[in-house]
């Protein structure tokens, strides 16, 4: 049977991957939701207006929206279907992307309810990455503890003669 750690990583990977495939698809095409697509177009126009450096670099709102959407779809597919280290790389890229989106929301002065989902999914991506990168076997770090009180040396045996060790 799979360990709880493995099940947690798999569940987070699939859920996060599907979410980012969905959100990336909304940024790329109006087929899923015309309202959400038009809202994304409006939001990305405000992001480019708020950050003139993007315009100077030749990045318009369409290019920014489609680039972010394509990256979300690609990383979401990797998170959902590809095993091993590529999941961690996709997780890292999505985490950077979420941080950029949070920056954009703060830049244009959006209220918390407009970017709360980005905060939540950023936290979930961070948790998944921390759980996945944590070493599997921690038993080597733990010392074997005596099982009964008879096996444990008393404080009097550990302390020098005539002194009691107080901890």
Curated annotation (Swiss-Prot):
Membrane-related topology note: Multi-pass membrane protein
Example of a GO biological process term: chaperone-mediated protein complex assembly
Tissue specificity remark: Brain (at protein level). Expressed in the spinal cord dorsal horn (at protein level).
Example of a GO cellular component annotation carried by this entry: cytoplasmic vesicle
Cytoplasmic side, ranges: 1-5, 83-88, 133-167
Protein name per the record: Novel acetylcholine receptor chaperone
Subunit structure: May interact with NGFR. Interacts with RPN1, RPN2 and CANX.
Keywords: Chaperone, Cytoplasmic vesicle, Endoplasmic reticulum, Membrane, Peroxisome, Transmembrane, Transmembrane helix
Lumenal side: 27-61, 110-114
Disruption phenotype: Mice show a complete disruption of the assembly and function of the neuronal acetylcholine receptor (nAChR) subunit alpha-7 (CHRNA7) in the brain. Exhibit enhanced locomotor activity, profound abnormalities in spatial/working memory and a significant reduction of assembled nAChRs in the brain. Display thermal hyperalgesia and mechanical allodynia accompanied by an increased number of microglia in the spinal cord dorsal horn. Exhibit elevated basal serum corticosterone accompanied by increased anxiety-like behavior and an impairment of long-term memory.
Function in brief: Molecular chaperone which mediates the proper assembly and functional expression of the nicotinic acetylcholine receptors (nAChRs) throughout the brain. Essential for the proper folding, assembly, function and surface trafficking of alpha-7 (CHRNA7), alpha-4-beta-2, alpha-3-beta-2 and alpha-3-beta-4 receptors. Stably associates with ribophorin-1 (RPN1) and ribophorin-2 (RPN2) (components of the oligosaccharyl transferase (OST) complex) and with calnexin (CANX), both of which are critical for NACHO-mediated effects on CHRNA7 assembly and function.
Lineage top rank: taxon: Eukaryota
InterPro entries: TMEM35A/B
Subcellular location: Peroxisome membrane; Cytoplasmic vesicle; Endoplasmic reticulum membrane
Region (Disordered): 135-167
